[in-house]
UniProtKB/Swiss-Prot annotation:
It comes from Dictyoglomus thermophilum (strain ATCC 35947 / DSM 3960 / H-6-12). It holds the Pfam family Ribosomal_L13. This protein is one of the early assembly proteins of the 50S ribosomal subunit, although it is not seen to bind rRNA by itself. It is important during the early stages of 50S assembly. This is Large ribosomal subunit protein uL13. GO terms for biological process: negative regulation of translation; translation. The gene is rplM. The keyword Ribonucleoprotein applies.
């Protein structure tokens, strides 16, 4: 029996919408990463982008467990000497709650060109509204 490898023409992409309200950040991000990679499909191939599009709404209402709201620190660096910035999860939620989910999912995807291509299929919105009604996204319960 020959190993199956998905071809670009065979891949059918779906759109899913996920409500992040009351969901734990890491658990939500791991499920989203699986869908973006395509691991939920029988045609999954590691070196081919077989994943689907994911729309995340209500990102501002995602839950962090324990004391992470005050203690978790996001680190950014510009590449210049002294160009580092530290921001707590509490400040990140106030400034851009979409980025919390984006960074959590980014860390769970492959590093490199394929991972960046998969990450482009993730759309995150702080509130309950999104501009992707034309794609007729399916509700996904995680």
């Amino acid at each position: 029996m020959k190993t199956f490898m998905a071809k670009k023409e065979e891949i059918k992409r779906e759109w899913y919408v996920v409500d992040a309200k009351g969901k734990v950040l890491g658990r939500l991000a791991s499920e989203i990463a699986k869908i973006l990679r395509g691991k939920h499909k029988p045609i999954y191939t590691p070196h081919v982008d077989t994943g689907d599009f994911v729309i995340v709404v209500n990102a501002k209402d995602v839950v962090l467990t324990g004391k992470k709201e005050q203690q978790k620190i996001y680190f950014f660096h510009s590449g210049y000497p002294g160009g580092h910035r530290l921001i707590s999860a509490k400040d990140m939620r106030a400034k851009s709650p979409e980025k919390m989910i984006y960074l959590a999912v980014k860390g769970m995807l492959p590093k490199g060109p394929l991972g960046r291509k998969m990450l482009k299929k993730l759309k995150v919105y702080a509130g309950p509204e999104h501009p992707h009604q034309a794609q007729k996204p399916k509700e996904l319960n995680i």
